[in-house]
C-alpha cells in the first residue's frame, strides 16, 4: 500500500479459546489446511511487509511463535491476558515510530486483503482517530451494535451498545462491531490508560476506545465490510467447521472460475494454497491438501487424496489413490487404489495400478507396475514391466537398502527382489523368483525350485487313502 503515513498491523493472537476445549492455542487451529493466524497474516502481508506486522501472543506463546516463525512477522508478548485493550497496550514501544495501526483478530481468518486496504484508506481519508469495520450479518444477536450520528446517515460513530444493554428499539439495528479497527497511534496511546475493567469479565476492552476517543473530541468513523463472513470469528468447534466449509467452497468457486471442473464442490476438500490447471476434472469426495499443484487436463476420480504433491499435465488418477509428498509427471496413470508415499517420483506415461505402493522410488517413462506390488527405495528405468505381486525387500530390520532396475527390464509376477540389488538393462526375471544377486544386462534370472512332475501319483495317493478308511 502506498501512503505517506507509516502504517503497522497488530494481530490479536493471545487468547486461549476456552470454548474450543483444546490443549492447542486457539490461533493454531486449522481451517482449509492452515492455522487461523496464518490466514490473517497472509491477508496482512499483501498490505505491509512482515516487519510491520506484530502478532500479540500470550497463551502458549512459544508454540505460536515457533509455528509462525517462517512468516517473518514480529511478536509482542502479553504475559497476562487481561483483554484486548491490555493486549494493544503491550505494543506501545513497538509502534512508537508508526503513525497508524490496524488491529486484526487472529481468530477471524476470512478477512480479505482488499478489505484491509479499504479500511485503512477510509481511515486516512477521514483523518480519524479510530475507524471501526462493521457489518450487517443475518443474525446480529450477541454482537455490540454500532450507532452512527445523524440517525445513521453519517460515517461518524455516536456510540457502540453491547447486546445486554440494547433496548428493543436499538436491537433493530443490525450493524455490528466486527472487532477490527484502525487507529492513529498518537491519540490511541494518549487515551488508552482511560480504559477501565468495569465490566463482567474485569478486562480492558478495546471497544471502549470509541466512547473514550469520542469524549476527547477525536473523530471516530465506521465502514462496512462487503461480506459479513469476512468478520466472523472462531469461538467453538462449530464455528471452526462452518468457516472451514465456507473457505473451501470459496476456493472451489475460484478454481471453477479459472477453468477447473469440480462436480459436487461441497463434497471436496481443497486447501487454500492448492493450485489446479485449467480443464482438469475433479470428481466428488476428492481431497487436495497442503501445497499441492495439479497440472492442466488431469482427471481426478472420487476418493483420491493428494497432499503436498505435484501432478503434471494430463494425469489420470482413478478412484481411491493416495499421493503424499510425491511427483507425478505428465500423462501418467495412477490407480485405482494405489499409494504413493513420500519421495515417490513417477515418470511420464508411467502406470502405477491397483494396490501398488511406492516409497522413495523413481519410476521411469512408460514403465508399469499395474498390480499388487511394493516398491521401496527403488530406481526404475524406462520401459520396465513389473509383474503382479513383485516385492522389493528393502529393510533388514536395521537399515534400508536400494534396488536398481535398468531400462526395459521384465520382472515376472510374484518376484521378490532382496536389496541391495541391481537388475541390468533388458534383463528378464522369471515369475516366482527370489532374486538375491545382481543380474547382468540382457540375462534371464530364475530363482525358484525346479518343478517336478510325478505322473500317476495322485491316483496312487487316493487309492492308499481309500484303504485306510
UniProtKB/Swiss-Prot annotation:
Main localization category: cytoplasm
Catalytic activity annotation: alpha-D-glucosamine 1-phosphate + acetyl-CoA = N-acetyl-alpha-D-glucosamine 1-phosphate + CoA + H(+); N-acetyl-alpha-D-glucosamine 1-phosphate + UTP + H(+) = UDP-N-acetyl-alpha-D-glucosamine + diphosphate
Active site: 371
Record-given protein name: Bifunctional protein GlmU
Binding positions for acetyl-CoA per the UniProt entry: 388, 394-395, 413, 431, 448
Keyword annotations of the record: Acyltransferase, Cell shape, Cell wall biogenesis/degradation, Cytoplasm, Magnesium, Metal-binding, Multifunctional enzyme, Nucleotidyltransferase, Peptidoglycan synthesis, Repeat, Transferase
UniProt keyword Protein biosynthesis present: no
A molecular function (GO) term: magnesium ion binding
Family membership: In the N-terminal section; belongs to the N-acetylglucosamine-1-phosphate uridyltransferase family.
Cofactor note: Binds 1 Mg(2+) ion per subunit.
Presence of the UniProt keyword Metal-binding in the record: yes
Quaternary structure and interacting proteins, as annotated: Homotrimer.
Binding-site positions, Mg(2+): 107, 235
Region spans: Linker: 238-258
Pathway(s) it belongs to: Nucleotide-sugar biosynthesis; UDP-N-acetyl-alpha-D-glucosamine biosynthesis; N-acetyl-alpha-D-glucosamine 1-phosphate from alpha-D-glucosamine 6-phosphate (route II): step 2/2; Nucleotide-sugar biosynthesis; UDP-N-acetyl-alpha-D-glucosamine biosynthesis; UDP-N-acetyl-alpha-D-glucosamine from N-acetyl-alpha-D-glucosamine 1-phosphate: step 1/1; Bacterial outer membrane biogenesis; LPS lipid A biosynthesis
Positions of the UniProt region annotated as N-acetyltransferase: 259-469
Pfam family, one: Hexapep
Amino acid at each position: 500500500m502506498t501512503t505517506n503515513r507509516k502504517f503497522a498491523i497488530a494481530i490479536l493472537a493471545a487468547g486461549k479459546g476456552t470454548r474450543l476445549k483444546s490443549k492447542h492455542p486457539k490461533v493454531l487451529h486449522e481451517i482449509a489446511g492452515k492455522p487461523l493466524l496464518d490466514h490473517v497474516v497472509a491477508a496482512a502481508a499483501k498490505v505491509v511487509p512482515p516487519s510491520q506486522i506484530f502478532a500479540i501472543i500470550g497463551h502458549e506463546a512459544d508454540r505460536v511463535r515457533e509455528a509462525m516463525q517462517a512468516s517473518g512477522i514480529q511478536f509482542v508478548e502479553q504475559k497476562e491476558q487481561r483483554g484486548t485493550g491490555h493486549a494493544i497496550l503491550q505494543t506501545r514501544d513497538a509502534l512508537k515510530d508508526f503513525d497508524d495501526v490496524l488491529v486484526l483478530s487472529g481468530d477471524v481468518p476470512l478477512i480479505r486483503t482488499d478489505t484491509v486496504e479499504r479500511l485503512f484508506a477510509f481511515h486516512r481519508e477521514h483523518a480519524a482517530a479510530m475507524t471501526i469495520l462493521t457489518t450487517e450479518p443475518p443474525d446480529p444477536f450477541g454482537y455490540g451494535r454500532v450507532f452512527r450520528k445523524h440517525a445513521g446517515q453519517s460515517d461518524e460513530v455516536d456510540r457502540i451498545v453491547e447486546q445486554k444493554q440494547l433496548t428493543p428499539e436499538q436491537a433493530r439495528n443490525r450493524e455490528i462491531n466486527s472487532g477490527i479497527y484502525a487507529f492513529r497511534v498518537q491519540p490511541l496511546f494518549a487515551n488508552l490508560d482511560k480504559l477501565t475493567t468495569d465490566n463482567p469479565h474485569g478486562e480492558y476492552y478495546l471497544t471502549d476506545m470509541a466512547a473514550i476517543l469520542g469524549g476527547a473530541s477525536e473523530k471516530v468513523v465506521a465502514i462496512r465490510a462487503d461480506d459479513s463472513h469476512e468478520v466472523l470469528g472462531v469461538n467453538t468447534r462449530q464455528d471452526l467447521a462452518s468457516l472451514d466449509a465456507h473457505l473451501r467452497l470459496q476456493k472451489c468457486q475460484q478454481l471453477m472460475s479459472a477453468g477447473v471442473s469440480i462436480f459436487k464442490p461441497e463434497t471436496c476438500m481443497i486447501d487454500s494454497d492448492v493450485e489446479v490447471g485449467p480443464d482438469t476434472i475433479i470428481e466428488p469426495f476428492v481431497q487436495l491438501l497442503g501445497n499441492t499443484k495439479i497440472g492442466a487436463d488431469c482427471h481426478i476420480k472420487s476418493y483420491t487424496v493428494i497432499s503436498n504433491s505435484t501432478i503434471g499435465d494430463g494425469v489420470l488418477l482413478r478412484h481411491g489413490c493416495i499421493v503424499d509428498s510425491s511427483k507425478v509427471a505428465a500423462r501418467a496413470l495412477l490407480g485405482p487404489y494405489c499409494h504413493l508415499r513420500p519421495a515417490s517420483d513417477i515418470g511420464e506415461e508411467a502406470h502405477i495400478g491397483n494396490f501398488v505402493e511406492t516409497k522413495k522410488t523413481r519410476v521411469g517413462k512408460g514403465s508399469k507396475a499395474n498390480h499388487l506390488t511394493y516398491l521401496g527405495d527403488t530406481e526404475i528405468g524406462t520401459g520396465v514391466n513389473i509383474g503382479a505381486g513383485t516385492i522389493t525387500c528393502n529393510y533388514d530390520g536395521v537399515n534400508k537398502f536400494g534396488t536398481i532396475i535398468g531400462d526395459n527390464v521384465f520382472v515376472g509376477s510374484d518376484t521378490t527382489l532382496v536389496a541391495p540389488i541391481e537388475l541390468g538393462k533388458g534383463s528378464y526375471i522369471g515369475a516366482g523368483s527370489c532374486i538375491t544377486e545382481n543380474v547382468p544386462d540382457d540375462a534371464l534370472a530364475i530363482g525358484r525350485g525346479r518343478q517336478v512332475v510325478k505322473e500317476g501319483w495322485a491316483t496312487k495317493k487316493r487309492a492308499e487313502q481309500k484303504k485306510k478308511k
